Amino acid sequence: MSPSPREQANAAVREFLAKRDWAAQTPARKRILVAFLRLAATNGYNSVSMRTLGRELGLKAPSLYSSFPKGKDQIVAESLLWFTHGFARDLLDAVQESPCAGDYWAALVRFHVAQQVSTPEADLWNLLVASDKVAGFLGQELREELAFWQSLHEEMYTAAAEEMGLAVTRQTIQAIFTLLDGAAHWSAWDGTVAHLESLTDYGVALSRSLLEAGTRTPAGA
């Protein structure tokens, strides 16, 4: 029996995750990456320098450069990849036990909304990737890897739609991503778990409305 579209999408994410071994990352490097993401998400990417990062960590510049010889550019690249792989791994954990396509879609959306609303680093990731399309400050290899992850993420949604019998277009999927990526801006989260759960449910309802509005015809018609 052939794997379902969802199973194929999940398998592609597992293959993507297997390409990098983050277990080998030293505690010192992880600490620097976490601090960079936190500072950049709070104060803005341009406000973070090797000096401000060192001050945040209580480290001298030589200690930072011993972990990241190429300086801030290397830290930016590795922090983006580290966040990407963490997001992908946690997303896979959140959806892979879903019993049906509808539940899988809902799990995708709930995770996406929760990340965007409660994790400032997710908004930073979107900002840096969007800014790179204009300014081109990320390296080509990094740009391609991030774009590849975006395509895998979109394919998870496409797979769910296909199993629900909906012939979805890429334009519709991108419209849904625009909605979900902007969750921090339309949610007005009050910081409580109950409100976050309500917001994720709302995200599911909005995404299904967009999905159905953008569907050309039922796949089985």
Predicted regions mapped to residue ranges:
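Amphipathic alpha-helical segments used for helix-helix packing
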Residues: 104, 116-140, 185-188
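Generic hydrophobic, amphipathic alpha-helix propensity
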Residues: 28-36, 53, 75, 79-87, ...
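N-terminal intrinsically disordered/low-complexity leader segments
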Residues: 1-26, 215-221
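Helix-turn-helix
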Residues: 20, 31, 39-74, 78
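Hydrophobic alpha-helical connector segments
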Residues: 92-119, 173-176
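Amphipathic alpha-helical linker/stalk segments
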Residues: 19-20, 79-105
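Amphipathic C-terminal alpha-helical segment
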Residues: 114-119, 159, 166, 173-194, ...
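Amphipathic alpha-helical packing segments from all-alpha helical-bundle domains
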Residues: 85-88, 92, 126, 135-163, ...
